[in-house]
Amino acid sequence: MIDIKITPKELNIRESLDWIVDAQCGGIDLFIGRVRPETLGNKVVQLELDTYTQMALNELQTIANYAKNKWNVQRILIHHRIGVLRVGDIPVIIAVSAEHRNAAFDACRYIIDTLKQTVPIWKKEIYEDGEVWVGANP
């Protein structure tokens, strides 16, 4: 099973964890990204995340399908937030359940690393004294 979502609404860790649990799985890996208070010495006020939704959903599905097949995992959850986020907010949750922990770890790392490289999500960091677009991806 795969659950993919891009939303302007706050992401819910508890709901994500409840969904990812599978009675047949001994390993669950959960990655939660948070907005940092500082980047390269600049105090972050907020982030603005934007995307081309359908293209991003398609790419996330491709990533999830690959991970599911390569590591034989049971469940994959990829939730990404868009819009304005404050320091401490959660822009991304990735969770993987598998029969064994190594498969869950490996699949989760692959998903977040590939998401950051290939999914069309744009991030603007707003600082106290300026702003900058950070790459083409989060």
Task: Show which residues each predicted segment covers.
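N-terminal, polar/charged subdomain of small-to-medium soluble alpha/beta proteins
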Residues: 1-90, 99-138
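Short hydrophobic/aromatic beta-strand micro-patches
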Residues: 95-97
